[in-house]
Amino acid sequence: AILRAIETCGKDNVYVVLVSDGLGVNVFKDEAYKNMTKEQKKEIRDKEFKAALRQLGVKEKNIILLSDIDKDSKNRFELMKKIILEFENNLKNVTHISHHYEYDDHPMHIKNGQVLKNLKDEGKVKDALYFMKPQYVKFIPEKNRVIYQVNDMSEYNKVKKACYEYKIVDIENGRHGVGYISAHSYFDNLLKSPNL
């Protein structure tokens, strides 16, 4: 969806918002991370997130980390709602994309989707789409599905490189591969498909 948005709207008009600080990932419970501060763990997570988005062509200034805006909040869903409404009111022709509000195996992803769905249901957001993990697509009628796939090897390689950013282990440069370690099956399964 990000590649298609950049192709359709241009790099200047594609924004990605990261809601969580990532401190809840299982890998951070390992002994190797025991003496790290929350800020150090967040920096590790943010570094690979931004690197992956750069591979897809997202401009650094268009990557919004809610945990940088509000470092103290334990619940960033109100801030997420505020950002969605700012986009909706200040930008033209916005399509918001979030995780699905019902079909996901992560409670925070579901909550993200519920925030967007509630705004859509209230008429405060005109266009909303929901990302779904492949195992849940069967629950959505075919006529309601929007499927984004790569068009060629160039796009496939961009997605592949973005996925590999989560796999890089280079401790001296703050790269620990936490995304891949935490959720390797998602990356592995995605890259098995030639169409992504």
Task: Please provide the spans of the model-predicted regions.
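Active-site beta-strand->loop->alpha-helix modules in alpha/beta enzyme cores, enriched
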Residues: 1-122
